[in-house]
Regions:
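Hydrophobic alpha-helical and helix-loop surface patches within well-folded domains
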Residues: 2-169
C-alpha cells in the first residue's frame, strides 16, 4: 500500500531481512521449526498497535516498519525489536498459548525477552543488557510500587477487556 517508491525501496530489504533473521534465530534457539504453513506481513496505515501476531501472520502499523530517510539508529533498533517481538510470538503466544488471557503476561514476557536476544547480533554497538534494563525496569517499578500495580495473573471475564491487561510489567 505504500505509495512512496523510494520509501518502499529503502525499507523493503531491511523488513524482510529482519523477519528472516528473527525466524532463523527462533528456530535455532528453540529447536522447533517454524510452526505454521505461511508467514504473512500486513502493514496497516491506521493500526492502533505497533504490531499484533496471529498464527502465520503479523499485522503492523505501517509507520512502525516504513521508516523515513531521517530515521535514526534508535528508530531502526525499535523496528528490529518490534519485528523480533512479534515473530517470537509465533512460538510464544501462538504455538504455545495460555489457556485464557488471565495469563497474558506469559507470552509477553517471553516475546520481550526473545526480542532483546534476537536483535543483539544486528546491533553490535548497542549495550543490549543496559538498554533492556534502562527501558524495562523504570517503567515496571513505577507501576509496581504504586496503587496502580496489577497482579501478574489477572482474571478476565470479557474478551473485550483484554487490552486492559497489557502494560509495562
Amino acid at each position: 500500500r505504500e505509495a512512496d517508491a523510494a520509501k518502499l525501496a529503502r525499507n523493503r530489504d531491511a523488513i524482510f531481512d529482519l523477519h528472516a533473521g528473527a525466524l532463523a534465530w527462533m528456530e535455532r534457539s528453540t529447536g522447533i521449526p517454524y510452526p505454521f504453513g505461511k508467514f504473512d506481513l500486513v502493514l496497516i496505515p491506521a493500526f492502533q498497535f505497533g504490531g499484533m501476531e496471529h498464527p502465520g501472520a503479523v499485522l503492523y502499523k505501517e509507520a512502525s516498519l516504513m521508516l523515513d530517510a531521517s530515521a535514526t539508529e534508535a528508530d531502526r533498533l525499535a523496528r528490529a525489536e518490534l519485528i523480533a517481538h512479534e515473530t517470537s510470538h509465533m512460538w510464544f503466544g501462538d504455538l504455545v498459548t495460555m489457556r485464557w488471557f488471565d495469563d497474558v503476561w506469559m507470552k509477553e514476557v517471553f516475546a520481550g525477552f526473545m526480542a532483546a536476544k534476537i536483535t543483539e547480533p544486528a546491533f553490535p554497538g548497542v549495550d543490549h543488557r543496559l538498554r533492556f534494563l534502562a527501558d524495562t525496569y523504570p517503567r515496571a517499578y513505577r507501576v509496581d510500587r504504586g496503587p496502580g500495580a496489577n497482579a501478574i495473573r489477572q482474571p478476565l471475564a470479557d474478551l473485550d477487556e483484554a487490552g486492559s491487561l497489557y502494560g509495562p510489567i
